[in-house]
UniProtKB/Swiss-Prot annotation:
Gene3D superfamilies assigned: Thymidylate synthase/dCMP hydroxymethylase domain
One of the GO biological process terms: dTMP biosynthetic process
A GO CC term assigned to this protein in UniProt: cytosol
Gene from which the chain derives: thyA
Residues binding dUMP, per UniProt: R29, R134, R135, R181, S182, A183, D184, N192, H222, I223, Y224
Catalytic activities: dUMP + (6R)-5,10-methylene-5,6,7,8-tetrahydrofolate = 7,8-dihydrofolate + dTMP
Keywords of this entry: Cytoplasm, Methyltransferase, Nucleotide biosynthesis, Transferase
Active site, renumbered: C154
Subcellular location: Cytoplasm
Assembly and binders: Homodimer.
Entry binding sites for (6R)-5,10-methylene-5,6,7,8-tetrahydrofolate: H59, D184, A278
The protein's name in its UniProt record: Thymidylate synthase
Family listed: Belongs to the thymidylate synthase family. Bacterial-type ThyA subfamily.
An MF annotation (GO) of this entry: thymidylate synthase activity
Length: 279
């Protein structure tokens, strides 16, 4: 029996079109200039496919590798460069250190008594033991550490939610909502959507749950002025159905996944579109 056809979804393209059409001119830290709106939300049903943008080719290796790096708790760009990923190069210091960025806050949030909190391990434990909790949250926005970071967190806060089984023999469904305080729509947001969708799949596998929705919520949602031509090109393209994600093994813990454990199939996409990064 053939698998049912996957629907074509355009949440991301609709978002981009909305900001490009209705955004206001606004300055920014980089001096580039943006077109911006405040507040937007997208919802992706992870059972309909893996939400990897199709109107341009997205570099999946960088997304997977960066997420695995976050989960190590490392602050070193060397870890990424050793694996051929250069997306953090513009912010790395001479010694390769990035300060207490995402992974450090996820895995080693410092406490006043000199200890550390592993937020990710706490999430896994809570999903397994108290799935109805409304406190299954990870924050990267550590106010005391912001000035030490090479780049302050853009995707700053996320929460998990388990919908209970609806019938005997079913499993609960895991959803995730991200709050992204600063959203570079052309370059950054496609990475962020796919990264947190992947993390939701990994968490679900580790906690014996099905996947539900990924909800992306943005604060300052902007298109840089030097991305306008690229955005017009991308919006001229028709999206394809999302690909499917396959996790090829179940490791002993969330922290034992390897790059080769993930396979994205049937990724139909338009050609890549290059654009400068605002630093």
């Amino acid at each position: 029996m053939n698998a049912p056809a996957r629907p074509v979804r355009s949440q991301y393209e609709d978002f981009m079109r909305h900001v490009y059409t209705h955004g206001v001119a606004k300055g920014d830290r980089t001096g580039t200039g943006t077109r911006s709106v405040f507040g937007y939300q997208m919802r992706f049903d992870l059972n309909e496919g893996f939400p990897l943008v199709t109107t341009k080719k997205v570099h999946l290796k960088s997304i997977i590798t960066e997420l695995l790096w976050f989960l190590t708790g490392s602050s070193s760009n060397h870890w990424l460069k050793e694996r051929g990923v250069t997306i953090w190069d513009e912010w790395a210091r001479e010694d390769g250190d990035l300060g207490p960025v995402y992974g450090v806050q996820w895995r080693s949030w410092p406490t006043p008594d000199g200890g550390h909190i592993d937020q990710i391990s706490q999430v896994v434990e809570t999903l397994r033991t108290h799935p109805d909790s409304r406190r299954i949250i990870v924050s990267a926005w550590n106010v005391a550490d912001l000035d030490k970071m090479a780049l302050m967190p853009c995707h700053a806060f996320f929460q998990f939610y388990v919908a209970p089984p609806q019938a005997a023999g079913e499993r609960g469904k895991l959803s995730c909502q991200l709050y992204q305080r600063s959203a570079d729509i052309f370059l950054g947001v496609p990475f962020n959507i796919a990264s947190y969708a992947l993390l939701t799949h990994m968490m679900a596998q580790q906690c014996n749950l099905e996947v539900g929705d990924f909800i992306w919520t943005g604060g300052d949602c902007h298109i840089y002025s030097n991305h306008f031509e690229q955005v017009e090109l991308q919006l001229s393209r028709a999206p394809h159905p999302y690909p499917t994600l396959h996790i090829l093994r179940r490791p002993d813990s969330l922290f034992d996944y390897r790059f080769e454990d993930f396979e994205v199939r049937d990724y139909a996409h338009h050609p890549a579109i290059k654009a400068p990064v605002a630093v």
